[in-house]
């Protein structure tokens, strides 16, 4: 995994390109993220950097967390996150990662917690079709068959049914950065990213999965 950055989703807006076409973008406050620890294969078994984000009051953290951050002379931070990389020698403890880590036109993956929708039914959660809406129908939004009869005599695990929708770790892949504002640490990403405004997100260079 390449090195990324933590940020806060601020909301969505639109900007216009040179041809006056509206582009929907999500504004993310990316960083600053000081590096609090560097892990190597010799000491930890794998190579990674640990970054912090979200300054808070000292009394909001435990003594163990404050002691860990003090080793890198980092102010109290709410979130810690690791990015695995084989190029740890390019980073130093105390170094601050900012929005200029990315550039306009770069393709990224954004990971966050999707908006929680509570207990949802079959149509909303899995896009099942409705039953007949006629006056005599008794099957408007029911699931239909959930399996066979006496054999196997049970519902197989993993059957799509009603339940909790959202509030899960989600990654939106292959999003394009439209603009970067290094002075204000803002990254404008084309399209939507997981979570509500104020949600924590992680931006990393795109990792192609499957066919290109």
UniProtKB/Swiss-Prot annotation:
The keyword Ribosomal protein applies. One of its GO terms (cellular component) is cytosolic large ribosomal subunit. It comes from the Bacteria. InterPro entries: Ribosomal_uL3 (IPR000597), Ribosomal_uL3_bac/org-type (IPR019927), Ribosomal_uL3_CS (IPR019926), Transl_B-barrel_sf (IPR009000). Pfam families: Ribosomal_L3. SUPFAM superfamilies: Translation proteins. Residues 128-156 are annotated as: Disordered. One of its GO terms (biological process) is translation. One of the primary rRNA binding proteins, it binds directly near the 3'-end of the 23S rRNA, where it nucleates assembly of the 50S subunit. Part of the 50S ribosomal subunit. Forms a cluster with proteins L14 and L19. Belongs to the universal ribosomal protein uL3 family. This is Large ribosomal subunit protein uL3.
């Amino acid at each position: 995994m390449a090195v990324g950055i933590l940020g806060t989703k601020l909301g969505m807006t639109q900007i216009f390109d040179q041809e006056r076409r509206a582009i929907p973008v999500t504004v993310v406050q990316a960083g600053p993220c000081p590096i609090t620890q560097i892990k190597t294969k010799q000491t930890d078994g794998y190579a990674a950097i640990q970054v912090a984000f979200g300054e808070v009051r000292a009394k909001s953290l435990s003594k163990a967390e404050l002691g860990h951050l003090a080793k890198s002379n980092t102010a109290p931070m709410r979130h810690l996150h690791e990015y695995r990389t084989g190029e740890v020698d390019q980073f130093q403890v105390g170094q601050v990662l900012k929005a200029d880590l990315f550039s306009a036109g770069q393709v990224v993956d954004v990971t966050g917690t999707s908006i929680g929708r509570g207990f949802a039914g079959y149509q909303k959660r899995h896009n099942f079709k409705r039953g007949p809406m006629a006056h005599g129908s008794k099957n408007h939004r029911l699931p239909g068959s959930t399996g066979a009869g006496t054999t196997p005599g049970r519902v197989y695990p993993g059957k799509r049914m009603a339940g909790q929708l959202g509030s899960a770790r989600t990654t939106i892949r292959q999003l394009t950065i439209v603009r970067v504002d290094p002075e204000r640490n803002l990254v404008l990403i084309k399209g939507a990213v997981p979570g509500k405004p104020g949600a924590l997100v992680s931006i990393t260079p795109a990792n192609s999965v499957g066919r290109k």
